[in-house]
């Protein structure tokens, strides 16, 4: 697999787009757009990204003209990216920006909800299976690789008798511990790399 899909490269090459801020890293929050989904479990990636933007005292996310995405500079060399598509098509907003900036998957940090972790737990990894997460599936398809970094925020499995789609669209508090810990994990990834960040976060 290549780091960015052929289709995304073609889109980045021929679509008329203004310059993006120079960046070496992308920090991607996964979720669904719109007030209906704003506070749901499936949107903890958005919540974490918002927390990071506030903590770094950066400008709010704004539309990136010519892309299906919102962006803002999170720190020097770090661009926060949020697809304006629904979760299942997240890669369509992210991959063309990665292609335009020449950013490999190894420097794309994706923050997302994780059913297979207890609520509040955070785990970091590079690559691996998408575990049925449609946002990750879209990113993998559009980037052409699984080798992006993942900040996984535990939301637990639904109780017996409750369907997963209903469960992930239930509301949660924006200040739950997993979101804050995930924001810390992103900062550690950027500053110290994956191994050091895992050592610091996985013991908590």
Swiss-Prot record:
GO terms for biological process: protein quality control for misfolded or incompletely synthesized proteins; rescue of stalled ribosome. It catalyses: an N-acyl-L-alpha-aminoacyl-tRNA + H2O = an N-acyl-L-amino acid + a tRNA + H(+). TRNA binds at residues 37, 86, 88, 134. GO terms for molecular function: peptidyl-tRNA hydrolase activity; tRNA binding. Monomer. Hydrolyzes ribosome-free peptidyl-tRNAs (with 1 or more amino acids incorporated), which drop off the ribosome during protein synthesis, or as a result of ribosome stalling. Catalyzes the release of premature peptidyl moieties from peptidyl-tRNA molecules trapped in stalled 50S ribosomal subunits, and thus maintains levels of free tRNAs and 50S ribosomes. Belongs to the PTH family. SUPFAM superfamilies: Peptidyl-tRNA hydrolase-like. The keyword Hydrolase applies. The record marks 32 as: Discriminates between blocked and unblocked aminoacyl-tRNA. The active site is at residue 42. The keyword tRNA-binding applies. This is Peptidyl-tRNA hydrolase 2. Keywords: Cytoplasm, Hydrolase, RNA-binding, tRNA-binding. GO terms for cellular component: cytoplasm. The record marks 113 as: Stabilizes the basic form of H active site to accept a proton. Its EC number is 3.1.1.29. InterPro entries: Pept_tRNA_hydro (IPR001328), Pept_tRNA_hydro_sf (IPR036416). The lineage of its organism: Bacteria, Bacillati, Actinomycetota, Actinomycetes, Mycobacteriales. Gene3D superfamilies: Peptidyl-tRNA hydrolase (3.40.50.1470). Its main location: cytoplasm.
């Amino acid at each position: 697999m290549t780091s960015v899909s052929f289709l995304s490269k073609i889109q980045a090459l021929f679509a008329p787009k203004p310059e993006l801020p120079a960046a070496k890293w992308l920090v991607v929050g996964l979720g669904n757009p719109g007030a209906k989904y704003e506070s749901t479990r499936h949107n903890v990636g958005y919540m974490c990204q918002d927390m990071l933007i506030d903590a770094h005292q950066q400008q709010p996310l704004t539309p990136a003209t010519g892309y299906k995405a919102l962006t803002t500079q999170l720190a020097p060399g770090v661009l926060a990216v949020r697809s304006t598509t629904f979760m299942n098509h997240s890669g369509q907003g992210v991959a063309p920006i990665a292609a335009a900036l020449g950013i490999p998957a190894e420097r794309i940090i994706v923050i997302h909800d994780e059913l297979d972790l207890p609520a509040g737990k955070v785990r970091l990894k590079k690559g691996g299976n998408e575990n049925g997460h449609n946002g990750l599936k879209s990113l993998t398809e559009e980037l052409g690789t699984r080798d992006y970094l993942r900040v996984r925020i535990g939301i637990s499995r639904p109780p017996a008798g409750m369907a997963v789609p209903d469960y992930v669209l239930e509301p949660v508090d924006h200040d739950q511990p997993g979101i804050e810990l995930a924001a810390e994990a992103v900062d550690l990834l950027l500053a110290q790399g994956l191994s050091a960040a895992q050592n610091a976060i996985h013991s908590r």
